[in-house]
Amino acid sequence: MKEYIAEAEKDLLHTYNRYQIVLDKGEGVHLYDTDGKKYLDFVAGIAVFALGYQNKAYNDALKAQIDKVIHTSNYYYNVPAIEAARKIKKVSGMDRVFFTNSGAEAVEGAIKAARKYAYLKDGCTDHEIIAMNHSFHGRTMGALSVTGNPKYREAFQPMIGHIKFAELNDFQSVLDQVTDKTCAIIMETVQGEGGLRPANEEFLKQVRDLCDERDILLILDEIQCGMGRTGYMYAWQRFGVKPDIMTSAKALGCGVPVGAFMMKEKVAQHSLTAGDHGTTYGGNPLACAAVEKVLDLFEEDHIIEHVREVAPYLEQRLNELADKYDCIKERRGVGLMQGLVFDHPVGDIINRALEKGLILINAGADIIRFVPPLVITRENVDEMIAILDTCIE
């Protein structure tokens, strides 16, 4: 394993603070390194592997598509993209879909759609977007510009212009930023990197009403919190606060790089048209075959029902841990997107857990994030808690 790490350090750009293991294969909710060591995975590729590793039906669908065609071009139609779009419309309630290669690309498309929508209304080119402090939407320039964390933005100024920031769950702070030039409000329905902070029902409904009154587009980023993780296919469905534009990725492809931004018909009819936006690989047959099969398996395997059964148990066990240790300030989160907030940095705890065969990740310096495969069991939760308990002691 050490020789692989040495080679990577020599050849790869140093943009990640990687843990000192080399992962080689997965099975169910477990990963194995190149030395054969087994790990219980409560990260799932950062909320990606909803179905776990080596799901046979999923793998078979990808193999079958590889044997047909992997990529064509968006100058032509392909059946997997048509079927995937139909199925994602059904579960999301949105009207139009654009497939991308990643979540960041989906956010870029959402921003462009909102600005074009506003431009067609009044011809102005100085429209404003309101985003949330502590948010994270991606590292491309547009997505970074609406990311409300200065540490990600500082070295890459100037950002795209006319972006303002408000506080999640503080409606007055949003009102304070609204002007006649506001074209969109963007937020994660549950903030991930920002500390597992859910937008509450009252706030979401107030923002939705404001957007309706002022013809402002509401963009909800469901890249991490979507695809069943909160016990609903998309987190906004908990409260019925439907966005005008929505982004999705991560578990949408369960390992195959794919994202999407979706919109209501009123936005689609008055925003992006031919030549406004495009992608070489987005919507390719292989990625869309993955999306299609993921959505089928969510229904066939009753994934959301399972999340609703196991998530309360995870919350209970995390609450017990929080009650046991004074250094844990609180538990936050929804469904299988949880966090424990500590009064000190959590890096050492995560490293000790890794040594004991448990994969965890942080969300900021003082929060351990839990975003496991959606197929985990109560027994997996118990095993995780037992290991984590020994790492905190």
Model-predicted regions and their roles:
Residues M1-E393:
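Conserved N-terminal phosphate-binding loop of PLP-dependent enzymes in the Aspartate aminotransferase
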